[in-house]
């Protein structure tokens, strides 16, 4: 401490041989002493300035008087644990996915990758998403900045489709390069109850009850289409519809139980346009020549419009409570378990499809809308992140965000890092109280989610 030597300067004593640590302090104090003498002769004009100079000694140079208390350091929130639900990367279209294909004026482009599989282009996109997430998690202290994470601190689990298995493997390597983390999964093609609880028979499902509940909650497919005339017009413009007229807005809609009662049977404009819209987005994201992206008529604006048509499918199959409380329940329970268990991995990654993200989002009460996409449409390689944060006061809160590459980032395989991030959106957790939706206390979050998981009869 320099306080005694500074006091001597104030008295006018000489200070030869001062310590290096105090020399600058003494110089400032000496200057202040001379200024004080001048100030006294000038009727106090500079009192405030002298005090400021003396204050500089304390604030900048750390020469607080003995016995003083240093200001408390305000701690920033710490990210303790993360659960991520990824959608697989860019894939080739599913067999029959473009249900409105016959309305097109020209043949559809051919893909070199077999139907439903991750494309080579899509593989690179997944790697880049994973590498970015690794940088962000390292910045937050969840992953190490160098080297491998501690054993058991990272877990990756994928659904049984080949595209999700491959995406999981790519993400595991990107999140911890060279560390040998293996993305787990059940036998390829089987029904994993975590991702397909209805198909696996893990939860009760009655098609008639499902239809009744969906109709009551949403008004049905025709009601969901209300207000989307512009999106339907965009689809018609891209397809051409000169050989076969396609006035989607005038087509009838119906929703019924499937033949076996274990699913839904949807007919009408949403069924025709949702998958077709997704195929058009995949053409652009894959990097096909623009002349092959909707035959040159799928502008970015129109792609965003047909992306919304794709998302309408989830308003039938995933977001209504009857569906979400079944399709999204296993993943929701994983979130609760991993946030409650201090021994759980700090990072848990689940790799599934857009339906899983939509169902879990519905249970959480979150909505997202990223530039270039339709509202609530999960892009390829996008992810829903749920973070458990410890506040400065020790309170643990849950925060949600959505991140995904833009269509142009996917198309060009753009560089991704902390200076060149993907699209991101902080999400409000509407299952929590209004004042808690951006940072929901863990007990309130768990209680609200348990309520959401109660099955409709």
Regions found by a protein language model. Name each.
Residues 5, 11, 15, 40:
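Cationic, low-complexity basic patches in intrinsically disordered or flexible, solvent-exposed regions
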Residues 70-155, 159-348, 352-457:
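Signature for phosphate-centric chemistry
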Residues 65-69:
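Bacterial lipoprotein signal-peptidase II cleavage site
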Residues 15-18, 26-30, 34:
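N-terminal amphipathic/hydrophobic targeting modules at extreme N-termini
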Residues 61-62:
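C-terminal motif of bacterial Sec signal peptides marking the signal peptidase cleavage site
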Residues 31, 35-51:
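Bacterial N-terminal signal peptides that target proteins for export
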């Amino acid at each position: 401490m320099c306080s005694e030597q500074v006091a001597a300067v104030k008295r006018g004593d000489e200070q030869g041989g001062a310590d290096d640590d105090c020399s600058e302090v003494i110089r400032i104090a000496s200057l202040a002493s001379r200024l004080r003498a001048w100030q006294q002769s000038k009727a106090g004009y500079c009192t405030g300035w002298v005090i400021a100079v003396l204050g500089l000694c304390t604030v900048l140079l750390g020469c607080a008087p003995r016995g003083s208390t240093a200001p408390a350091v305000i701690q920033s929130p710490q990210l303790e644990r993360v659960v991520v639900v990824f959608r697989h990367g860019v894939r080739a279209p599913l067999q029959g996915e473009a249900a409105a294909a016959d309305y097109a004026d020209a043949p559809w482009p051919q893909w070199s990758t077999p139907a439903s599989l991750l494309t080579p282009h899509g593989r690179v996109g997944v790697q880049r998403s994973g590498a970015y997430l690794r940088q962000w998690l390292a910045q937050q202290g969840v992953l190490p900045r160098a080297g491998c994470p501690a054993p058991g601190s990272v877990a990756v689990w994928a659904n049984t489709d080949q595209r999700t298995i491959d995406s999981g493997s790519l993400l595991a390597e990107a999140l911890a390069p060279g560390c040998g983390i293996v993305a787990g999964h059940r036998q390829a093609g089987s029904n994993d109850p975590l991702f397909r609880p209805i198909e696996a028979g893990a939860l009760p499902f009655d098609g008639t009850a499902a239809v009744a509940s969906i109709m009551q909650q949403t008004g049905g497919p025709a009601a969901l289409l209300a207000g989307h005339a512009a999106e339907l017009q965009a689809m018609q413009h891209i397809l051409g519809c000169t050989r076969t007229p396609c006035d989607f807005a005038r087509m009838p809609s119906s929703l019924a139980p499937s033949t076996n009662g274990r699913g839904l049977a949807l007919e009408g404009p949403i069924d025709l346009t949702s998958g077709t819209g997704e195929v058009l987005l995949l053409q652009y994201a894959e990097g096909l020549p623009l002349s092959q992206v909707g035959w040159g008529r799928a502008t970015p604006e129109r792609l965003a419009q047909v992306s919304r048509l794709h998302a309408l499918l989830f308003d039938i199959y995933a977001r209504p409570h009857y569906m979400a409380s079944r399709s999204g329940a296993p993943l929701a329970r994983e979130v609760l378990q991993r946030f409650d268990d201090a021994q759980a991995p700090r990072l848990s990654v689940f790799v599934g499809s857009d339906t899983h993200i939509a169902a879990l989002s519905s249970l959480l009460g979150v909505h997202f809308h990223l530039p270039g996409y339709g509202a609530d449409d999960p892009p390829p390689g996008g992810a829903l992140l749920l973070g458990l944060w410890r506040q400065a006061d020790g309170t643990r809160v849950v925060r949600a965000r959505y991140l995904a590459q833009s269509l142009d980032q996917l198309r060009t395989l753009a560089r991704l890092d902390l200076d060149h991030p993907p699209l991101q959106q902080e999400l409000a957790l509407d299952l929590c109280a209004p004042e808690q939706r951006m940072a929901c206390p863990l007990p309130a979050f768990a209680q609200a989610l348990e309520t959401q998981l109660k099955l409709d009869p």
